[in-house]
Amino acid sequence: MREIVSNALSVRHAAELAALVGYIDFTQPLVSSLVDRVLDIASVLTAAPSYARVEARPEGHPWHVDTGSKGHMGWCCLSASVLLTPPESFTGGGLYFRDEPETAVYHYRDLVLYDSDPGNEHCVTRSRGDRRALIMFFRGVENG
């Protein structure tokens, strides 16, 4: 499963979240509104070990699925992210899915949701400039 919810955040709200680099609580009002959008699509839980953070990571992420490279996030059944800075504020930093390796996703203000199925293996390329994203990892109801 992979879905995109377009324009999930306003320009102003994206900028507000971009200023909050680090771990962030699911009850933060802007994050909470995004979680509500996630819950419209999937049954997930926000209790630990689920977590969210605003990330500024110029080194990107190598190819992986969100259960962790060593299985350390085996509880993760759904991930979601929103690019919080406009693509013109950085270079590189594309989100790629293995099944579409030539297509970069620059999901500014769009909520991208995907499950932890191996078919959703993805990476984020190195970036220069100001690239920030909200990333959220959820455990499933069945993982209780």
Placement of each model-derived feature along the sequence:
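Fe(II)/2-oxoglutarate oxygenase catalytic core
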Residues: M1-L111, G119-G144
